[in-house]
């Protein structure tokens, strides 16, 4: 049973927002209150808010005491792409505590942009390409484990295996050290489960940041090792300490950051490096897992798309264009496979949460609606991605072909699964890199079907929308 907690407040109590002549604003004058929904038990805040926007044909829906969800297309440029401060919700992402401010948790746009510049070398596509041999080490082991599961007819829980793969790849690329998840085939020290619990905690306590500073955000908790994902933190700390003692240069992210520190110590501290490493892994792995699952799941729901994707891959294989360990440069030349991935970004964005910004001094006007200084205005990728004016009348269906038909620039401009503007995800190049490789490998080498084809997957919106509960049978494909 879905149990939700809501905060219903008439808009007229929020000074400066009431305008009863404006039907585009869902407010108290319509006897409908907009809920602020927290997933205490399994719930779908993204669908709740989407339906409020649609039901009342409103671009503006109040979702908390001081926050308005905006679905108008102009919101992407005026809110997310503007250099205005983020809401305090983001400070929850300082891990392991508030001393470690990373790009995600930095609220001030100027300081955020400076951090991005200092860390950008590690995230560049050219640097990630140099780490491909490390990614291949994990990919090869991943193939071995899938072969074992295939040979033993053991059902595959992709929510686990994609997470294992993503965490280990991120460990290798960030500081050349795998976490060992794929090797063990288990969630070591419950690190992944605890990461999910932490995201759940953030989705609720993010509304009460002061409480976070008294509990998990308090440095005392991290010093005592009471953080829920200590395996991730411990591995990061050991890797940084080992790298400082080891003069060997590796082409990983940490080496690039250490190079910046050696040349310009005033620009980047060890805390910055540790914070960036933890954020890269903690925020990156589950978003990659959610997206990989979305591609496979929706291809299974649409057999014609699955066949088309595998036919494209088989043709490339027959032409000798795919290596035993698929290279990124090969995978990006598969247009339908890339369209399937892009459609998964749209149809099931891993971040399905409203992204808040603070209206600056002097207020701002969005689509004719004035918002006073200090009000939170937020945009949800899930809602923008289901706008029929942007993505067409079939926006509620998974259709990779939309990305191969005619002009796609308008859709590209509103594809915000990695965010946009100064707060765009710094790890997006790496995510695209490893997703392209692992999905091509999976579809080339295995036949996949759900154990119970009639059962739908499950997911809850807890900032991230990471699916689970759709076990699959796999078997090695026989190619001519």
Where do the language-model regions lie?
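Cytochrome P450 C-terminal beta-domain/meander region
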Residues: 55, 59, 65, 262-266, ...
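Cytochrome P450 I-helix active-site segment
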Residues: 132, 136, 190-197, 300-351, ...
